[in-house]
Structures are given as C-alpha cells and as structure tokens.
Design a protein with these regions (language model features):
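N-terminal Rossmann NAD(P)H-binding glycine-rich loop of SDR-like oxidoreductase domains
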Residues: 51-68
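NAD(P)-dependent short-chain dehydrogenase/reductase
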Residues: 175-265, 271
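Active-site Tyr-X1-5-Lys
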Residues: 155-177, 182
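Short, positively charged and aromatic/hydrophobic N-terminal segments
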Residues: 28, 35-36
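Mid/C-terminal beta-alpha module of Rossmann-like enzyme folds, strongest
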Residues: 252, 259, 267-328, 340-356
C-alpha cells in the first residue's frame, strides 16, 4: 500500500523505509544525507517494489520506462552504483545491440558479455529478467522455448556471445526469465526495415555509391562525410526533408539493402512490460516474444498501399520463424502473439503516427 511521506520526520522515514526495503541489503536511509534506497520512488512520494532497470537510455529500456516506473534505473556509465543493492527485480536490458561492431571484433564483444555477467552478479537481484535476442539461434524456423539446443557452428559472434551470456545467467540465476526478442519497433527506433522504410535516406554509403550520387546532387555531396570505417556517413547537416525527397525519387535508397522476400517477425515494444510480467507471474523461464513472419514486401504494401517494390538481392533472403509455447498466456493463439493481419495493422498504425 502507498505510504504518504510528506511532513514525516526523517528518523521515522528511515525506520519505515529500511523495513520495507530490507535493510539487510546494505542500503539504508540516513536523514543527514537524504534518500539512498534504490527501491523507493521518492518523487512520487510512495513506497514502490524494489525494482531496477539496467539499460535505461537504450531503445528497449526507454520503451520499458514508458510503461513502468522503476524504483531505480541505470546504464553502463553508472551501473556500479547499483552493486550490492539486491533489488527484488532487475530487468537487464543493457546488452549492446550493435551487430556490426560485435561481428567485427568478437573478443571485445565477448568481454562486454563478461562484464554484463559481473554486473548482474554484483547487483545480486532476487529475481532477474535478461533481455536477449533471436540472434542466439542460427536458424529460428520452428524453434520453441523447449526445442533442443542448436549447434553454434557458423553462428556469428553477435549471436554466439549473447547465447553465452544466456548460459552464464542460467548458471548464476536458475530461476531467471530470459526473453528473446525478434525485430522491434517502438518509440526511439533507429534501425531495421521499418526505420529504413520511414527515413528512405541511407545512413551510410559505400565510396563508389557516394561518388555516383554526389555527382548527381550537391545535396548528397554535402550530406555525407567519410568515416573511419571507409564508408560515407550521414552527417546531419543537410535539409532532411529535401534529402528524403531525393532518395524517394531515386532507384537507390535505404530499401536497397533489404530483400523484399525476407521474412521478419516484428514486435511492438509497447507491450514488453506487460508480457514480461505475465510470464514472470506464470514462472516462465524462457520466453520467445514472436509474431507471425511477414515479408518486407508485405510490410511495404501494408504501409504504402503500393505493390511495386520487388527488390531481390544475390544472397538468400532472411527467414525468421520463431515459435512460442506461451502465446496463449499473452493473449495470442497457436505459436504466435497475434495474427499476421493484426501485426501488419499495428505496424501500419505505428508507421503512420511516426513523428521525427
């Protein structure tokens, strides 16, 4: 129950708050220095469940914060302040999602996974939710939570290292809930096909493509700068609306990087908190949050109303088809959280309400 604290003497607050938040955690209130209890939401003036969000400034973390007020939150630069706090619940959404960087330097990425394991150990939560990825599977087609473990041979470093973190977490916290996410959309989206469909403007260009387009347009010439990785990167100085109009009218734009035949599973982060809570209540240990596979061409048609996009790349298209045993628990049916039409309708609503 909520406890009003306005006007209450400091020593009484200390006694009440330390009792509520389990002073054995080693985190206490001192009237002399103020509130030092992560599990208390002082701004709201009420005692909250002792929960912590790691990764509060990230894409997933930001969407979780929009749905739930955590008693404490942190990110990579201040996470050590949470060591030893032993929250009732820690949602760890602080694993980097930069696939390109992970695959370019696997050892450095594995070191990040080791650091994540140590962070969780030092925080020592009573309950843990680890936000993971569909990328831990070399082939997601027809895979359920209870499917046999796959061979990791050929699995890119990004997926292999995050699978290792899952295994470490299971060793250290046997009752943890591990959540595997597919392609995502929600507030703050900055990548994937939906982002490309909205922006149209490529974030990076190969040198030869930059030279070709810069020769056609002074706007493109000034909009990109050569980066350390050898690509030309969007620098943000050009008129974005004019740049978008240029690429929308050009045969080459951000959509050129996606095969129209590729099938993805798009999950709305707006429902993540409620889905996690339902799974935790049911004591689920591994959760696949999966919607039906939809092709990029189907998404394009649903959003734009056009059927004139048929981009095909030399490499085989992506084909994701993760399944879940817990779909019914979360309001779905069969193996998925919704129908394909419901997924396309929700994506369309999101895309049409998007504001830069």
């Amino acid at each position: 129950d909520a406890l009003p604290i306005s006007g209450m003497p400091g020593p009484y607050i200390a006694i009440i708050y330390n009792a509520l938040c389990d002073s054995a955690q080693g985190v206490a209130f001192s009237p002399a220095i103020g509130y030092n209890v992560p599990c208390i939401n002082v701004q709201r003036g009420i005692a909250m469940s002792c929960d912590l969000l790691v990764g509060s400034t990230g894409f997933v973390g930001g969407n979780l914060l929009a749905k739930h007020t955590f008693a404490a939150e942190c990110h990579s630069s201040d996470i050590t302040a949470q060591y030893g706090t032993r929250p009732d619940l820690c949602v760890y959404a602080g694993v980097p999602a930069a696939m390109f960087l992970a695959n370019a330097d696997p050892e450095a990425d594995l070191a990040v996974m080791r650091a994540a394991r140590e962070n969780i150990r030092q925080i020592a939560p009573k309950r843990l939710v680890l936000i993971s990825s569909i990328a831990v599977l070399a082939d997601s087609r027809g895979v359920y939570e209870d499917s046999p473990a796959q061979d990791t041979e050929g699995l890119p470093a990004y997926g292999k290292n995050r699978l290792q973190l899952e295994r470490w977490v299971r060793e250290d916290f046997p009752d943890a809930l591990i959540v595997r996410l597919p392609a995502l959309y929600g507030a703050g989206i900055r990548k994937n096909f939906l982002f490309d469909l909205h922006t149209i403007t490529p974030a990076m260009l190969r040198p030869e493509k930059y030279s070709e387009l810069a020769a056609k347009s002074p706007l493109v010439k000034s909009a990109y700068t050569l980066a350390d990785n050898g690509f030309y990167k969007l620098n943000g100085t050009a008129d974005q609306a004019a740049l978008r109009a240029f690429f929308a009218a050009n045969d080459f734009n951000a959509l050129a990087f996606t095969d129209a035949r590729s099938r993805y599973q798009f999950y709305n982060l707006g429902r993540l908190w409620s889905d996690m809570e339902a799974a935790r209540t049911a004591d689920v240990k591994l959760l696949h949050l999966c919607t039906p596979p939809v092709s990029a061409a189907e998404v394009y048609a649903a959003v734009t109303g056009k059927t004139d996009w048929h981009n095909e790349l030399p490499k085989p298209p992506f084909d994701y088809d993760l399944r879940s045993r817990h779909a019914a628990l979360l309001g779905g049916s069969g193996d998925y959280l919704c129908t394909k039409q419901q997924e396309l309708d929700d994506i369309t609503r999101f895309m049409r309400s998007w504001r830069d």
